[in-house]
């Protein structure tokens, strides 16, 4: 009897539809999302498209930071209007590399407010919308997207671990073992994205922790291109990311 029950559960699991099956998904991001970077390799969104039969609207552009995300979102809005089911944001590694200050989420001031019929002094906080800081940029983007797409699912992906990369004599990017020009390590940016998830009620998939990718390790060379690029995953690295995203998305509705 137990064996029969197990078989039934297995069949149900295999035939149950993934909540993101056949959906229209927009991807905003940087070079790891950009179809023009490593064009001969399948990207994570391409694997998700194969696994879920999704329609992909890809707007990622190499080198972009959080301050550029609204340009991509506005282009999505112009080209597709509201005809999109979900938006995925994969951004942050270039903010770290460029030395963007982390900044603050809020400003705080004391105001007089009516509480239970009495005018009392209370502290009040307001979001910082400052495009010169990382948290200010995230606040600006998520505030705008929540207003632009109030009924749509929005999901953030954290940056993955970074290895050394050299693309030219003047474009040399140290590995994540080094802090950036403002003294921050990459995990400060990863943690800020995770904090933003709670602040803005936007789900986050922590690829930094869950993907298993450590491009600085020689033993994981199968996940990165040959040469001096230990920053961008190759097709196998993207496949691993896609599998992680696929299973995390099982717990999230794509539409409401």
Q: Language-model segments: what does each one mean?
A:
Residues 1-4, 152:
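Positively charged n-region of N-terminal signal peptides that target proteins for export
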Residues 3-23:
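Bacterial Sec-dependent signal peptides at the C-terminal "C-region" and cleavage site
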Residues 8, 29, 91:
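Residues that line or immediately flank small-molecule/substrate-binding pockets and catalytic motifs
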Residues 12-13, 40, 163, 244:
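Alpha-helical transmembrane segments and their juxtamembrane interfaces
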Residues 16-19, 25, 59, 142, ...:
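Residue-level detection of beta-strand scaffold positions
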Residues 18-62, 67, 72-83, 87, ...:
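Serine-esterase "nucleophile elbow" of acetyl-processing enzymes
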Residues 51, 73-256:
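Alpha-helical cap/lid subdomain in secreted, periplasmic
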């Amino acid at each position: 009897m137990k064996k029969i029950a197990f078989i039934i559960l297995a069949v149900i699991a295999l035939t149950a539809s993934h909540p993101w099956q056949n959906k229209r998904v927009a991807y905003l991001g940087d070079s790891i999302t950009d179809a023009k970077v490593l064009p001969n390799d399948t990207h994570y969104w391409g694997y998700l498209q194969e696994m879920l039969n999704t329609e992909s609207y890809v707007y990622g552009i190499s080198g972009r930071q959080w301050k550029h995300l609204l340009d991509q979102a506005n282009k999505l809005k112009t080209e597709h209007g509201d005809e999109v089911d979900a938006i995925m944001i994969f951004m942050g590694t270039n903010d770290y590399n460029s030395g963007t200050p982390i900044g603050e989420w809020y400003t705080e001031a004391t105001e007089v407010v009516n509480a239970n019929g009495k005018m009392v002094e209370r502290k009040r906080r307001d979001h910082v919308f400052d495009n010169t800081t990382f948290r200010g940029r995230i606040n600006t983007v998520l505030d705008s997207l929540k207003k632009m797409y109030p009924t749509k699912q929005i999901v953030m992906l954290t940056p993955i671990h970074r290895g050394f990369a050299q693309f030219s004599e003047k474009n040399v990017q140290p590995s994540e073992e080094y802090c950036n020009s403002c003294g921050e390590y990459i995990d400060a940016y990863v943690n800020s994205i995770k904090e933003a998830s709670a602040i803005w009620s936007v789900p986050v998939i922590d690829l930094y922790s869950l993907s298993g990718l450590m491009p600085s390790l020689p033993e994981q060379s199968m996940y990165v291109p040959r040469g001096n690029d230990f920053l961008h995953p190759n097709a196998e690295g993207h496949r691993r990311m896609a599998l992680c995203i696929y299973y995390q998305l099982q717990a999230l509705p794509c539409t409401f």
